[in-house]
Swiss-Prot record:
The keyword Amino-acid biosynthesis does not apply. This is NADH-ubiquinone oxidoreductase chain 5. It is a multi-pass membrane protein. It comes from Leishmania tarentolae. GO terms for molecular function: NADH dehydrogenase (ubiquinone) activity. Belongs to the complex I subunit 5 family. Keywords: Electron transport, Membrane, Mitochondrion, Mitochondrion inner membrane, NAD, Respiratory chain, Translocase, Transmembrane, Transmembrane helix, Transport, Ubiquinone. The lineage of its organism: Eukaryota, Discoba, Euglenozoa, Kinetoplastea, Metakinetoplastina.
């Protein structure tokens, strides 16, 4: 039963990351389209869009690093709780771990 809860958790996590990817490419494609558009020739708007694109890239990479380290911590935490205390419902302790952080 541990592996069932573990797999369902990571299915939800991967689906969430997939949704974030879709939103990211939708936003960045719009920014790139406007950056190379004929109506957007003024230097100020190109610089503004370039800074905005860099800021969006920074936000998403920061978000990915936070998710990556959180998933690693929850993976280790899940294994420690399961093998140390032999409990079935490890996701509850993952939630406690997130609240603790």
């Amino acid at each position: 039963s541990f592996y069932l809860y573990y797999a369902s958790f990571f299915d939800i996590a991967l689906f969430t990351v997939f949704i974030i990817d879709i939103i990211k490419f939708y936003i960045l494609s719009g920014v790139i389209f406007y950056f190379f558009n004929i109506d957007c020739i003024m230097f100020f708007w190109r610089v503004f869009l370039f800074i905005t694109m860099g800021f969006l890239f920074f936000i998403f990479t920061t978000w990915y690093f936070i998710c990556f380290y959180m998933y690693i911590c929850m993976f280790i935490w899940n294994l420690v709780i399961y093998f140390r205390y032999n409990l079935k419902y490890c996701l509850f302790f993952c939630m406690l771990f997130i609240i603790y952080i």
